[in-house]
Amino acid sequence: MSGDSDGRLNPVPDPERMEVFIEAMTPPGPAHLQGLEQEALLAGVPIIRPQTQNLIRFFLTMNRPARILEIGTAVGFSALFMQHYAPEGCRILTIEKDHERAAAARGNFIKYDRGTAAGGKKTGIELMEGDAAQVLQEIREDASFDLVFMDAAKGQYIRFLPDAVRLLSPGGILITDNILQEGEILSSRFAVTRRNRTIHARMRAYIRALMEEPRLETLLLPTGDGAAVSLKKK
């Protein structure tokens, strides 16, 4: 319950109703990507939720990054989404471990990139296939990124964090998706099923590491399935 100025208690709005309202008030995403979004949902491939799309779009518009790093490509929807809203000339490097998804993403970068279809231009997206923990270590520090989007295996976030911070430009933004794990992160580890306890513990460790990292200023948001927005201090 919350109170108003005259001391009366007001009921807390239902989270699901709030989510439906916000999504209803939000303009639709890029029309040329709606087909890919539906294909992914029907195939059970996880892609960024509408509220997370709004969050990313906001920071792309505000920060106008020249270089973006994505950890976790899946079938390429989020990379194409970011390309649509990023400034002209922005370069996106995206990393995917799963070979089948990486192959699907490469096909989608050709199929859904309007520049490529129209004039044979480069997509501005480079995909590196492999374990992100290893790939990140191979990227030189002088190849810094203005925005890093982390949306890969949730139990591995803690492994990716040191290199994600290292490669983030001062003043750059790190967006981490799915930190609430469908609300399970709120529960005690003893209330979580045994098979989910490891990822539960690792996600809590990741969130603590974000909040305690002296180079970052981090805000935790209930957006979508939870998102952390971290600013690298200058």
Language-model segments: residues:
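Conserved SAM-binding loop and adjacent beta-strand
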Residues: T26-P28, L41-N54, T61
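Short N-terminal amphipathic alpha-helix/helix-capping patch enriched in small hydrophobics
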Residues: M18, H32, T52-L55
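N-terminal auxiliary segments of SAM/dcSAM-dependent transferases
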Residues: M1-P30
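A generic structural signal for short
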Residues: G7, A24-M25, G44-V45, A152, ...
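Generic secondary-structure boundary/loop-capping signal
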Residues: E19, G44-V45, T176
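S-adenosylmethionine/decaboxylated-SAM
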Residues: P50-K234
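A short, structure-level motif marking secondary-structure boundaries and short turns
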Residues: V20-I22, A40-L42, K121, A191-T193
